[in-house]
Amino acid sequence: TARLAEPYADDPEETGQWVVDPEELGELVAEATAAGYQFTAHAIGDEAIRAVLDAYETDAAGDPEASRHRIEHVELADDDAIDRLAEGGVVASVQPNFLKWARVDGLYEARLGEERTARTNRYRDMLDAGLRLALGPAGMPEGPVPGRPHARNAPPARPRPPGTAAP
């Protein structure tokens, strides 16, 4: 889900919706882990990422590395979320091809605003924190190949806010 902590830039009344309520998510994670499965959740927005991490941490009574839970997208992770991902051994499954929407005047800027757009897809920060990244296309028809240049060379057209790094 693209649930945000603050409203969307183009809709001040909207923060996104839960696809699965956070309480139910915790129950699903516990069931999957008890059965020996890796759990994967899609989380794009900062609030969604926090909810998934909460569920994973609540479930991590044993060895969090053993479960190898994963979050797909992880596009708007703040410093705290990146630290939590690393500490919990959560795999960040990211899609560099989505960076095409982070260009100036692109979809992200329209929906998130310039400041939040500059904080999306923080791959360098994730790697520096020790995260394991899995790169994939997330079902994009052109496959993963077009995303490779974005994964390697995607500095934004404008400077990022202090404390953030180019992907």
Regions found by a protein language model. Name each.
Residues 1-38, 82:
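Active-site-adjacent helix-turn-beta-strand microarchitecture at beta-sheet edges
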Residues 20, 26, 72-73, 114-115:
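Residues that cap or flank secondary-structure elements
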Residues 29-40, 47-69, 83, 94-167:
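His/Asp/Glu-enriched, well-ordered alpha-helical/loop segment
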Residues 77-91:
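Short amphipathic alpha-helices and their capping/turn segments at secondary-structure boundaries
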